[in-house]
């Protein structure tokens, strides 16, 4: 069924709670892809792959599939930046449904660690982004309350959070006329980790004014609830604006969700305390028997302090290290994660699956190696090893019906596919670039002449090399021959990288040389030529997937072309050339059959740079990095002031979801602390 809201058609489907705002009808390969994926889900296929080329509208296809199936969906993205983009797009498609954002809520995180070689213990240090914490709590609330939910998440979703059973047991249901003692209500709020604050009323707090209790729900950023009591009875429930105090809506019932995912009923905490004491007794005895008296004293002192806090307050610093006891799990059992909150019929979309799947697989071992040191030297009990991300095989067992989304699916997707659905034809009519193979022996001189030809008509060139040395030498050679050129490599941080791309688009230089130009964000419409040097050197940077990804960088220009410099055609080259040619044939045939004339993508320069680059800064030469500030001459007072300023900037950028800017402020903070205090602030080497 189709209706219209503000001139945007709204599409609904039978038995689906989703209302899809459809600014344009599906085009190109989208209609067939949507139909096939929806059929596959209906037929019960556990795994499907959407092979969608760059610029083919994969997010739009996902939104259509979700709307047709009418089931809650989890969309897994490889990083925060891409997750934020997907979140914004899904909110445009589903403004009337629950689109949620679940990523790590740390602006800054330094994990607890011990470096035996230096006898250095590094305390856990972190800065939590309150806005993202609220969004995480909102995500789990939506899953418990409704079916029309889309959650965009990063790999953070495989890390342990509170057990959904305990979380659900702590929910407070309020109804008009319900009998509950004023004191009991306050105690329930404290048990749910709400803080009483009669002066600073903010998210996750409550205040008491006579018989009136105001609660600012942890998962809500805009509205609070007023509970008016009379003689141990809930007389009125009202939503109000916590800033102005204006009443918004009278309620008959209201549900208050816990202030944290880690809340635990009192009975469970007391039971866990006894289990922790038993483990402490065994561990301390083992250390003493082994002659490790320092470790025995250390584990006793640290754990006894935590036990006292748990007994008195119901939580302690580092409570996640006792999650096995608190959730009643056995040794080695997987922790509860966001996936446990999903209903059994949920859908999982793994975006950029060739990156996301290996990322999920790599989390467990890195976390384990750090914790083994903490356990071995008496800083933590062995049960802390079970506070961990999911192992890959555990993640696999929990995966609901899954759709992998990628332009270059990897081996895992090939081994787990009920069907592969192609989305090769772009709605814009653009076709993949033509490919030339030329001899590697004359690659530099040939590249120089090709670059001059492109520059003469106002187009840009990307060049990818195998080594950093080659990139630097080639940059120098091209510069000596009058080409405006810069290079990009791993030593350049996020913000500098974005600045370089901005300058390339603005025409401040014409050729960009790099080693691995596959990373998200390098879709530059002005680029008409991609040159791959030494394309016949088999390896990670010249694999079939890497070549296809690199060739695709020229796919947004009507004159797009890729040149592979090689003396022999390798298996990877042949596969990449054949795949690109297959796509071109299909795209050209579709355009001819439908009378579509391709045109270069028009994208405002600020679209790539928004939220990252602030203001025009004059930069000359081939280096865009500003010299780092000099801190050696600062006195103690100035250093402290600078640290506070940088921390404030970092938190402000993270609050605005400007993760690149937040990362730049964080790195500057690291440098300042390291130069001032002579300590490595990054944690373990």
From Swiss-Prot:
| Residues annotated for ATP binding in this entry | 52-59
Pfam families found in the cross-reference section: Helicase_C, ResIII, UVR, UvrB, UvrB_inter
Cite the entry's keywords alphabetically. ATP-binding, Cytoplasm, DNA damage, DNA excision, DNA repair, Excision nuclease, Nucleotide-binding, SOS response
SMART domains in the record, alphabetically?
DEXDc (SM00487), HELICc (SM00490)
Q: Where is this motif: Beta-hairpin?
A: 105-128
**What GO terms describe the biological role, i.e. biological process, of this protein?**
nucleotide-excision repair; SOS response
- Looking at the record, the residues that make up the Helicase C-terminal domain are 443-596
- Which InterPro entries does the UniProt record give? Helicase/UvrB_N, Helicase_ATP-bd, Helicase_C-like, P-loop_NTPase, UVR_dom, UVR_dom_sf, UvrB, UvrB_inter
Q: Which residues form the UVR domain?
A: 640-675
Top-level taxon = Bacteria
Subcellular location per UniProt equals:
Cytoplasm
Q: Which GO terms describe its cellular component?
A: cytoplasm; excinuclease repair complex
Which residues are in the Helicase ATP-binding domain? 39-420
One GO MF annotation is:
DNA binding
What assembly does the database describe for this protein? Forms a heterotetramer with UvrA during the search for lesions. Interacts with UvrC in an incision complex.
Q: What does this protein do?
A: The UvrABC repair system catalyzes the recognition and processing of DNA lesions. A damage recognition complex composed of 2 UvrA and 2 UvrB subunits scans DNA for abnormalities. Upon binding of the UvrA(2)B(2) complex to a putative damaged site, the DNA wraps around one UvrB monomer. DNA wrap is dependent on ATP binding by UvrB and probably causes local melting of the DNA helix, facilitating insertion of UvrB beta-hairpin between the DNA strands. Then UvrB probes one DNA strand for the presence of a lesion.
**Domain statement:** The beta-hairpin motif is involved in DNA binding.
**Member of which family?**
Belongs to the UvrB family.
Q: What is this protein called?
A: UvrABC system protein B
Q: Which source organism does the UniProt entry give?
A: Aromatoleum aromaticum (strain DSM 19018 / LMG 30748 / EbN1)
Instruction: Name the lineage.
Output: Bacteria, Pseudomonadati, Pseudomonadota, Betaproteobacteria, Rhodocyclales
